[in-house]
Amino acid sequence: MARYRGPRVKIVRRLGELPGLTTKIPNRNYPAGQHGPSSGMTKMSQYRVRLQEKQKLRYNYGVSEKQLLSYVRRARRMKGPTGELLLQMLEMRLDAVVYRLGFAPTIRAARQYVSHGLVTVNGQAVTIPSYQCSVGEVIKSNSAPIVEHAKTFGGVVPSHLSVDKNNATGKVERNVTRSQIGLTVNELLIIEFYSRK
């Protein structure tokens, strides 16, 4: 499946707040469409609940269905809670780290910065948004828009990262924990969704 390029606020109205997808806040808190306001009346099936949790993760981090399934399979092979390992792998992607450092307004914008070669990791230009950042790696950019956004960023940088806003330089201090992930999602439902695949 290709990258999603459609209306983003429509997705936020259906799934809830997705900070990595868009910074816009919808005016209406019900799904778009003719039956949007009354859609909250119907009982959601267990499948739909799990599907919506999975879609939240997909749209927030901008990964395809195939990529997400690959992350789930990799998390299953690792030791530890599968759901937390899945979130940790997604959060340690280079585009997600660039976004969380405050260098970009969304993960989508961070992905574009990375793929255009505007971000370096330990002094080397990395153009792969899915690159897994490790502890101790230094992420830096000299691009004017990134430096400007880093200086004016008013959000909170998670404690597993450290940032120098004036130089647009950040460092991965330690692995991310579940409490530091800025997305409200039930990872156990996502693992259950993929349990048959």
UniProtKB/Swiss-Prot annotation:
CDD domains: S4. Residues 92-153 form the S4 RNA-binding domain. The keyword Ubl conjugation does not apply. Pfam families: Ribosomal_S4, S4. It is found in: Plastid, Chloroplast. One of its GO terms (cellular component) is chloroplast. Keywords: Chloroplast, Plastid, Ribonucleoprotein, Ribosomal protein, RNA-binding, rRNA-binding. GO terms for biological process: ribosomal small subunit biogenesis; translation. Disulfide bonds: none annotated. Signal peptide: none annotated. It comes from the Eukaryota. One of its GO terms (molecular function) is structural constituent of ribosome. PANTHER family: 30S 40S RIBOSOMAL PROTEIN, SMALL RIBOSOMAL SUBUNIT PROTEIN US4M. Part of the 30S ribosomal subunit. Contacts protein S5. The interaction surface between S4 and S5 is involved in control of translational fidelity. HAMAP family: Ribosomal_uS4_B. Belongs to the universal ribosomal protein uS4 family. NCBIfam families: PRK05327.1 (NF003717), rpsD_bact (TIGR01017). One of the primary rRNA binding proteins, it binds directly to 16S rRNA where it nucleates assembly of the body of the 30S subunit. With S5 and S12 plays an important role in translational accuracy. This is Small ribosomal subunit protein uS4c.
